[in-house]
Amino acid sequence: MQLSSLAAALGLPARADLAGVEITGVTHNSSWVEPGALFVALRGANTDGHTYLPQALQRGAVAVMGEGLPDGVACPVPYLTVPHGREALADAAAELAGHPSRGMGVVGVTGTDGKTTTAWMTRHLLRAVGVPTGFLSTVGYELPDGELRQFPAHFTTPEAPQVQQFLAELRAAGAQAVVLE
């Protein structure tokens, strides 16, 4: 996807330096950057993702997105300034994945106790009435045909790019609904 198209989809103003830049993926983790990636520098309680900008660029990031470059930090690739980095990460991931949840029924289960039971029961009920349903939990995901897949070991809770990737896989496997724990 062209960076200019992604920026437009995110509601960002058009800029000449975005033309011709091809984005092949998005991540907030500099060690997961692959050539062609958009690196999203998130600010956290203990660290600022901009600290990892050199590593992301070395690994092949072709653009960076964040809530603003810190003073004294240079960025030799296009930098997209957004008001909310984590929200922009989610929106960019959905856009790059083709918004896989559109057209699917999506059930989210949150809370302290009973999430897994509630999510599995919901999945079972949807399948019982003939709705091909995928399932996404904190340990893995299940395709509509019942095939279980575990997340790679480095995931504890999948972030937006991984969730969108899994949703795209579920949709490609025929899911008409998904239950997210």
What are these regions (language model features)?
Residues 88-180:
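Phosphate-binding loop of NTP-binding sites
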Residues 1-91, 95:
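N-terminal leader/targeting and accessory segments in enzymes
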